[in-house]
Amino acid sequence: PPAAAANLGPDAQARFINLKAWRAEVAREHNLPAYVIFHDATLAAIAERNPASLDDLQGISGMGAKKLEAYGAEVLRVCQQG
């Protein structure tokens, strides 16, 4: 796994992989590099926290208000699908 995800437990690893797949899709749709959506470290932090609400996403490094608004609901959906 990437360094960002090296310390994650098995459930968080699975969420991280799902989040990376989702990010790749979004990046393709918007014709952006993946890191512009979220860095690996941000995805790893999200995977570790396993957010259940938008409030849970606040305060994660790399998750600003704009990204929370743009991607928050999708990120929660991806985390819940595992």
Tell me the role of every PLM-derived stretch:
Residues 1-82:
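Accessory DNA-binding and partner-docking regions appended to nucleic-acid-acting proteins
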